[in-house]
UniProtKB/Swiss-Prot annotation:
Pfam families: FHIPEP (PF00771)
GO cellular component terms, A-Z: plasma membrane
GO BP terms: bacterial-type flagellum assembly; protein secretion
Transmembrane segments: 24-44, 46-66, 71-91, 121-141, 209-229, 247-267, 296-316, 446-466
The protein, known as: Flagellar biosynthesis protein FlhA
InterPro entries from the UniProt entry: FHIPEP_1, FHIPEP_3, FHIPEP_4, FHIPEP_CS, FlhA, T3SS_FHIPEP
């Protein structure tokens, strides 16, 4: 065994599970050996029994599988099982023709049992049963499963672009991480591969059914010729012997084939849920007492027709009525959602206390009553999990944990509306319709969709609320399709990023310092208040967040402040030196890699005017300010057409002035100074803002 492992380049200390890699080659060798080598009857019995056991196992796995991809190996198993049955037919045909004249046990006990016991030793009945099984397998199960697999493969392939865009939208919104996005993309690809493989694998099963019919005819004709001409058997005796053996061989192969085909039909017709096929069938067939009562009434009427087997019909009528009564009793025991707690009247008003003072939450959300299931943990509301993912992703990217989102219902809002509050003030609102999907036009969608026209609440893109049945069509037309909870979560994520500096308070500053102290205690020792005050540090970090600069690199921030704070106390000046120290990461944020960067620049004449205005403290002339704003807007549009980041590169002395000036009118514009760009970067001006 050690030599075999070394020859196959396998580890010598194999565990049991490591032998699984040899299952495929061993099965192929077994199939080839059955086709070439003559096998004794006992080995044939073992292989026929193994084939039956394999088919039953495959059917049960298909029944208990909850997702199609949980049994992604099924097309390959279908191929191997088909080859196994055909090789068994070849081996059994060989032994029937060679030793069939010796009696019914020539091909083994399994073939004899199927030929005698299952059809009563009557070859005419056996032929009829065999043909019926082949027709069921070939014309009904296999043909239907193949058609479903073909249509499923077509729809899965057509819907792949939309699914990929939906995954990218969730990733960009922070609803999922990179690992989860990779897993979902892999699932989409595997699903397309699976249905494509099933479309082809179904042809193997249909071919197997045809081969079974041909093999039966060949066995009967060949057996007659061999028995009469070579073994001098009577024609009637030869026909009976070889036909029974052939029927037994055909049945013992076709019954597993029928089971495997049924498993294929179960796999391609199931809907992916958290329940297996049996649970879906039971819960959906037997969950309505009225259906049971009506079915019992029909059976009862049939049972009273003269000449009918009254006992059987009335027995099932009673069983259905009993089942309906039991289901009705279970449903009546479930508490209704309308039950409300009884409020006791207060005879005397209690004195007000400080606990009656309601403090405003840093971040809150109010929802209408139709959106309550989305935020109700007991009703498996998806929005709660998405909000947790948003906060975690934001903390990983920006460097601090945003406040908890306090969610409450508001009956004064429209039923499908929500609004997002920061310190009690509304900063965003929108609508979401559970059970429907928002089809967002990213700019390249084709055609229109029936539904309620609206706008994406996060980015203002044109969108339509559509029914679930139109989801695949919308994805094919190029729309980004997201569910209601994703719409709300994306809007919340956008607002948290937009108001990151406002949500960062002194408490978050202290918590961040405590976190840094755990990792680098020497760095923060005597830093507060020895070097800077907590207020100054908070203001510096807030200034960075206001311009979308991550504060994850607290080591660099603290070291820079420790170096410059003794000589400078102005938070804005300290922010400028910290930005220079963080220049590499700031540039990397907008220009990944180390190559050329495409930026907007300032005309030299305009730069001189701005420097003079800054030094003189006179401010910008109204006309100059308007021209600067208009040209900045045009340059921003050119950057967008080029696919370049909206970055304006200016002199270090002008950066803070222009950033404050452009922030209100062009919040998407990012202003960087020349000192924040490393020497290893090549700068190319795509647009120039001048005074003309």
């Amino acid at each position: 065994m050690a030599n075999l492992a070394a020859l196959l380049r396998l580890p010598g200390n194999f565990k049991d599970t490591q032998w699984q890699i040899l299952a495929g080659p061993i099965l192929i060798l077994m199939i080839l050996s059955m086709m070439v080598l003559p096998l004794p009857p006992f080995i044939l019995d073992l292989l026929f029994t193994f084939n039956i056991a394999l088919s039953i196992m495959v059917l049960l796995v298909a029944m208990f599988t909850q997702r199609t991809l949980d049994f992604a190996a099924f097309p390959t198993i279908l191929l191997f099982s088909t080859l196994l049955r055909l090789s068994l037919n070849v081996a059994s045909t060989r032994i029937i023709l060679m030793d069939g004249h010796t009696g019914a046990a020539a091909a083994g006990r399994v073939v004899e049992a199927f030929g005698h016991f299952l059809v009563g030793g009557n070859f005419a009945i056996g032929i009829v049963v065999f043909v019926i099984l082949v027709i069921i397998n070939f014309m009904v199960i296999t043909k239907g499963a193949g058609r479903i697999a073909e249509v499923g493969a077509r729809f899965v392939l057509d819907g792949m672009p939309g699914k990929q865009m939906a995954i990218d939208a969730d990733l960009n919104a922070g609803l999922i991480g990179e690992d989860e996005a990779k897993k979902r993309r892999s699932d989409v690809t595997q699903e397309a591969d699976f249905y494509g493989s099933m479309d082809g694998a179904s042809k193997f099963v249909r071919g197997d059914a045809v081969a079974g019919l041909l093999i039966m005819v060949i066995n009967v004709v060949g057996g007659l010729l061999v028995g009469v001409l070579q073994h001098n058997m009577a024609v009637g005796h030869a026909a009976e012997t070889y036909t029974l053996l052939t029927i037994g061989d055909g049945l013992v192969a076709q019954i597993p084939a029928l089971v495997i085909s049924t498993a294929a039909g179960v796999i391609v017709t199931r809907v992916s849920t958290d329940q297996d096929v049996g649970q879906q069938m039971v819960t959906q067939l037997f969950n309505n007492p009225r259906v049971m009562v009506l079915s019992a009434a029909v059976l009862g009427l049939l049972g009273m027709v003269p000449g009918m087997p009254n006992f059987v019909f009335l027995l099932f009528t009673a069983a259905l009525l009993a089942l309906a009564w039991r289901l009705r009793g279970k449903q009546s025991q479930q508490p209704t959602a309308a039950e409300a707690p009884v409020i006791q009247d207060q005879q005397q008003a209690t004195e007000a206390t400080w606990s009656d003072v309601q403090l405003e939450d840093p971040l809150g959300m109010e929802v209408g009553y139709r959106l309550i299931p989305m935020v109700d943990f007991q009703q498996n509301g998806e929005l709660l999990g998405r909000i947790r993912s948003i906060r975690k992703k934001f903390a990983q990217e920006m460097g601090y944990l945003p406040p908890v989102v306090h969610i409450r219902d508001n009956l004064e809002l429209p039923p499908a509306s929500y609004r997002i509050l920061m310190k009690g003030v509304e900063i965003g609102s929108g609508e979401a319709h559970p059970g429907r999907w928002l089809a967002i036009n990213p700019g390249n969608a084709v055609g229109t969709l029936p539904g309620e026209a609206t706008q994406d609440p996060a980015f203002g893109l044109a969108a339509v609320w559509i029914e679930s049945a139109l989801r695949e069509q919308a994805q094919i037309q190029g729309f980004t399709v997201v569910e209601a909870s994703t719409v709300v979560a994306t809007h919340l994520n956008h607002l948290i990023s937009q108001y990151a500096s406002d949500l960062f308070g002194r408490q978050e500053t202290q918590q961040l310092l405590d976190r840094v102290s755990q990792e680098m205690p020497k760095l923060t020792e005597d830093f507060i208040p020895g070097v800077v005050t907590l207020t100054t540090l908070h203001k510096v970090l807030q200034n960075l967040l206001m311009e979308r600069v991550s504060i994850r690199d607290m080591r660099t921030i603290i070291e820079t402040l420790a170096e410059h704070a003794p000589n400078q106390t102005d938070p804005y000046e300290l922010t400028a030196v910290v930005r220079v120290a963080l220049g590499r990461s700031i540039a990397q944020q907008w220009f990944p890699g180390t190559g050329e960067i495409q930026v907007i620049g300032l005309d030299a004449a305009l730069e001189r005017l701005l420097l003079q205005a800054l030094q003189g403290g006179s401010g910008l002339e109204p006309g100059l300010a308007d021209r600067l704003l208009e040209q900045s807007r045009q340059a921003l549009q050119r950057q967008e057409m080029l696919g370049a980041p909206p970055v304006l590169l200016v002199n270090h002395a002008l950066r803070a002035l222009l950033a404050r000036f452009l922030r209100r009118s062009l919040p998407q514009m990012v202003v960087l100074s020349n000192l924040e760009i490393g020497d290893n970067r090549q700068i190319r001006m795509t647009s120039t803002i001048g005074v003309a």
